[in-house]
Amino acid sequence: MAEMEKEGRPPESKRSRKPAHPVKREINAEMKVPSNRPLPGAGQAGNLHGNSPYLMSFAENTMNELLGWYGYDKVELRDSDDIEIRNYPDGEMRQHISVLKENSLPKASTLENSSGSPPHANSSGSTPTSRNGVTAESSVNPSSSKEHGGLPIIVPLIPPPLIKAPAEEDSSNVQIMCAWCQKVGVKRYSLSMGSELKSFCSEKCFAACRRAYFKRNKLGYVRNCSAREEEGVPTHSLSKDTPRLVLKTNSDVLVCDWCKHIRHTKEYLDFGAGERRLQFCSAKCLNQYKMDIFYKETQAALPGGLCNPPLPTSDTKSESGAGVQLLTPESWSAPLSELRSRKAPSPVGATIAGPSGSTSGSPSEAGTVCSSSSSSSSSSSSTKIPTPRPHESPSLPPPHPPPISGLHPALGMPPGSPPMVMTPRGPVPFPIFMEHQMMQQMRPPFLRPPGPNSPHSNPMIPGIGPPPPPRTLCPPSSPMHRPLLSPHLHPSSTPTLSGNPPGIMPPHPAAHMPGLPFPPVNMMPSGPIPVPPIMNIGMPSLAPLVPPPTLLVPYPVIVPLPVPIPIPVPIPYNPQRSGDRPGNDGTLPNTANEQKDSKAPPSFSSRGEERDFQKAPPNSDTLSPEFSKQTEQGRTNMADLMVKMENSGKGSSEHSHKDTPADGVIDLTTSHRSRQQLVIQRAVTCVQVKAEPGLSPPPALLGETELDGSTSISTGTAKDDHRDTYSNAESPLASVALPCADPSYCSGTPPLSQPITCSASIIPSNITTAKTEPGSATPCNVIVNGSCNLPPTESLIRTPPLEQRPQVDTCRRTATVCDEPAGADLEGEDLKENSCLATEKDSAGKRCSNDQSAITTGTGDDKSQSPEDDPSGEDHAYALPLMPKPGCVIQPVPKPAEKTAAILPCGLTAPLTGTVPMEMEPPLKRRCLRIRNQNK
């Protein structure tokens, strides 16, 4: 090899490896040949697909050569030498020949020797060779001459000698065993390998074998060359002999009989003796082959019923099943005839009902079969039974799997005979099996509670009363039961034998009931009696039997247990509403009525208006954030009904601020929706009034209030009232609900009953409405929304009564706009008083006289502030922080006076009294105090 490579191989090998362009040229020339002369195979039958053999061989050769170039570099050396030896007297240019040629030449020689096909010419002018029915004579000569030119064109011209088209002599519909896949089929391809001609059923098998053959040839050629070189024989002289040598050496290189691969780096392992010797590339392949053989033999030996569960190899079952005993647990100690005779009925009929019926004659045998199948079947039939068992294991699965296989022996002990039981120790005699069955019978009493399921589990034992218990025991021992019961039942089975079976087993039955219920039922009647004898006899035998079940379980058995899984269901919950409800339990139902009555008024307050009003007054804006915060807090704490007054002393000054910014603090509605849409649906008994520091109305607000005129005075009064409310709320009534104690006040608020929107126009309109429609809303709930109160107050002051009228009208507030500021103020004061009284009643203990004095002090400030600020202040005094939106919306809803009062906090009255002159404040405060005292 080395010499050959040194001589001329490198350059020529390159040519042979890269003949792309030259090959194309040659191909073109060759393809043109038919036009000039008839194709070599023109007269012969069409190849493969009806194409001329010449063209077919050309294509096949080309493909083969390509495979050689890219897949087998060194194959070209050997092939080229062989081909050139035959084609050329001198071996100089032989190396140019492509791998395909090389393969074809050795194949040709083999064909000559083995198939008797016409010998392929060894010389360049060889007689036409019939390969695939193609004559390569003409092509060989020109190709050889061209090869000297360095173009290995011959490859396409030489049809692969290995392939014989089905159309050829061999192609007749001859049934052959494929040399590759070992399947019987029509002969489609043949390949000469060494001294034998191999036939293939398909192109796929042929290609795989050819590849392996190439590898062998390459390896053999290398070996031969190395041997010859060592001997000192010149390569040229060897060249002619090389093909034969190569073939011989190829015979040494074998394809692994299991994986069908050629592994040059590994030494093959020989297996078998005589004519048929198998070679395997590794111990793994050898072991797999042995396992396959063993499996096939076992299946063949097993009776039909037993063989069914095992595996697809059942094809071979019939072959060796009848009289051949294989190395199986059953064959060790039990005659196959017995197994077959017993199992023959059981697999079919006894599988379901047969187990009881077929084994009824020999319950002990049936039990042994079951036990053996349970113990040994876990290994063999575990694949089949375990699969169903995981699902069925709780109840019927164990018994059903045995029916599937026929009897338990069939499932778990394909090889074992009924008398022989497979255990961790090994096959157990039938008597031991009987003992094991006895143990199983002992189990049934324990399993009796599960018994109801026994009919299911007893599908195998349905007919046999006492025998069934053994089978029931068998199911437990069977892989299906073993997973569940083996840990408990087997340990308990031993105690059972000792005399504790009932004690131990009952717990297990409970635990095992899902899986074993069927055995207990049948076994309970017969099981309890046999248990003591079985316990004594079976103790030793059971010990071996019990462990196997645990060992035999190949698959984990999943026992479905119903476990309640809590599914969280989100329930919409509004803390504000809930807070209002607990505090307003008495008033809530009324509030609902009020809501119904005042559903129209809620539309009065438009948050947009309230917001606009808030924006207008700077002081109100400054205070509104605080108030909004308070309102938000109030929402969260509505249930608590906490009036958040940081300082009762601050209540007056802060309250005036809040009155401005926190006008909406008086949120009697639990939610924004109630504010907007409904008059206070829920009497906000929980009025959380939080006096925020700095509530004292800024001078600017006071100035605004003064500018507004009478409204500013009323606002001041309202603020004073609110301050009182805040102080009271802060002290005793911080957490007290503020329902209207006096219906009269609520009725007094009827002008307020019309909801006052936060918008300035709305609030004045509310005041006016109070005047015009004191009776329009009988009991009224005044809802003051958070910070909105300030803007409404401003609107009261700033907005002309005419503007207020349309707003009031839109809000369903019938009120003459504050055309008469004085009159409107007075009416507003009245409304304030009413609302204050109502709120005072609501907040009775919540607001102290000190708070009222503080409110009075703040009232002057509030007056100086814009009337909007004042209402907001008032809202703070009486307002619940519950409503987050700024602006005080007083939505009077006709309803019971108590409810209305509860809904109307003093803060509400404050916005109403925003128009009340300052003079009115002291009396209003007094009234509020009185109401509060009454509530207390």
Swiss-Prot record:
InterPro entries: RAI2/SOBP (IPR026092). Residues 1-14 have a biased composition (Basic and acidic residues). Coiled coil: none annotated. Pfam families: SOBP (PF15279). Keywords: Metal-binding, Repeat, Zinc, Zinc-finger. The keyword Repeat applies. One of its GO terms (cellular component) is nucleus. Belongs to the SOBP family. This is Sine oculis-binding protein homolog A. It comes from Danio rerio. The lineage of its organism: Eukaryota, Metazoa, Chordata, Craniata, Vertebrata.
